């Protein structure tokens, strides 16, 4: 979870106030907190009572992302552009509407159609996550959600620190 959280902050800085309900953002850029080109993430802002309160995010390793060789692993690469398409934060869906130009630009640079389907599945998973989160927010309210989210993050931080201290 924490590997995705810094990118959410980066996306907020990147788009500023231009993040809307219904947006779906792709990202894999190693120069802006991505870990490798083939690991493409989908980010979906969650708005509750008109405010951005959370994100859902899904990351998957894709079979291809373009580049000099099929599959993305190029042991002879001397620069990142030989490893595949770099995707800085980009809205593929804005305010619930597919940006066909962006969608087609991305997939025109990828060899395998299965990647398009995998990315549709990632969007679906992020959308289901958003729906479920909105159900929880509606049932328990923003205050309880925020308190439990912070408690979960704090517990995770403590466990991670304990594991590192044990090394």
Model-identified regions with their sequence ranges:
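A glycine- and small-aliphatic-rich helix-loop capping segment at beta-alpha/alpha-beta transitions
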Residues: 1, 43-47, 74
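Gly/Pro-rich turn-and-neighbor structural signature
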Residues: 1-27, 33, 141-167
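Solvent-exposed alpha-helices and their adjacent loops that cap or buttress functional pockets
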Residues: 16-19, 35-37, 49, 79-80, ...
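GAF sensory domains
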Residues: 26-28, 37-43
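Short, Lys/Arg- and Gly-enriched loop/turn segments at beta-strand edges
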Residues: 33-39, 65-66
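A short, hydrophobic, proline-anchored segment that marks a local hinge/packing element in signaling
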Residues: 40-49, 57
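Gly/Pro-rich active-site capping loops and adjacent beta-alpha segments
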Residues: 52-110
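N-terminal leader/propeptide and maturation segments of large enzyme subunits in energy/redox metabolism
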Residues: 86-166
């Amino acid at each position: 979870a924490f590997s995705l959280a810094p990118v959410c902050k980066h996306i907020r800085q990147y788009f500023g106030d231009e993040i809307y309900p219904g947006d779906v953002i792709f990202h894999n850029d190693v120069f802006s907190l991505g870990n490798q080109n083939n690991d493409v993430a989908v980010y979906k802002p969650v708005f509750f009572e008109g405010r951005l309160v959370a994100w859902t995010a899904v990351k998957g390793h894709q079979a291809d992302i373009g580049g000099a060789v099929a599959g993305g692993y190029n042991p002879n690469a001397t620069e990142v552009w030989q490893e595949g398409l770099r995707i800085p934060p980009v809205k593929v869906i804005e305010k619930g509407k597919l940006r066909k130009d962006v969608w087609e630009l991305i997939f025109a640079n990828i060899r395998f159609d299965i990647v398009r389907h995998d990315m549709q599945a990632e969007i679906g998973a992020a959308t289901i996550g958003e729906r479920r989160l909105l159900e929880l927010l509606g049932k328990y309210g923003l205050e309880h959600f925020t308190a439990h989210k912070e408690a979960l993050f704090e517990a995770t931080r403590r466990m991670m620190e304990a594991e590192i201290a044990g090394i």
